């Protein structure tokens, strides 16, 4: 992906990714159970990331790569990117059990993703804490004018996370 992604490589890659998982007719913006679950899961992540960013004094509307004029969560969307695979993984693992209107159990499963584990800085931590570590490490990078030291998470498959 190039700077500013003028060739829309990220979008094309996402399209290919979802079609590989759910079939050649899958459209990400369609009104269906899979998209409902993806949207709900991403909203949970976005909320947790926003909470952490605001606690460090960031304005979530001012993004690094996401710069939508009418998006109040550009920075949140930047920071949630490394966590998206955990939602994708859960939805793929559960897509046959989803209904267009998500059940309470579906929603609880997606909310509980914040309690799944990731590796961050060589330690196994909950996703909700990995988010905080990522933001804290970003603050440190800014304060020290260095690019290395950003604690990016490594998502652990659910069956290995226990």
Model-identified regions with their sequence ranges:
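Active-site helix-to-loop segments that bind/position phosphate- or nucleotide-bearing substrates
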Residues: 1-162
